[in-house]
Amino acid sequence: MFSPDMLQETISKIEARLKNAGTLKDDQKTELLQLLSTLKGEITTLSDTHGERAQSIAGFTEVSTHEATRAEKHPELLKLSVQGLASSVEGFEKSHPSLVALVNRIATTLSNMGI
């Protein structure tokens, strides 16, 4: 069941993980935190009409961030989590194009970090 508080909690966890990630360069942290800030607004808006989908997007963002920032990388898990993240916005291309573009940018950024 969707809860706006759960959504905000998930975003806060991602933000904390990024801020404390020792595996990220400062410019990567800055970029991802800016993208996350924008994502927070986008999925908050989406949650008004599609609460569970908004939570899924936040959840896949959290898992993808975890995989991209962990000290011991597991490329296959990162790939799967990023694919899930990209899939989480399918169907919103017309109604929420900026959300789709943003999530795709986050997915690409996280994927590139796992190289």
Model-derived regions, located:
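A structural signal for well-ordered alpha-helices, especially hydrophobic packing surfaces
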Residues: 15-18, 22, 39-47, 61-68, ...
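Strongly charged, low-complexity linkers/loops
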Residues: 64, 68-86
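Amphipathic alpha-helical binding modules
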Residues: 79-115
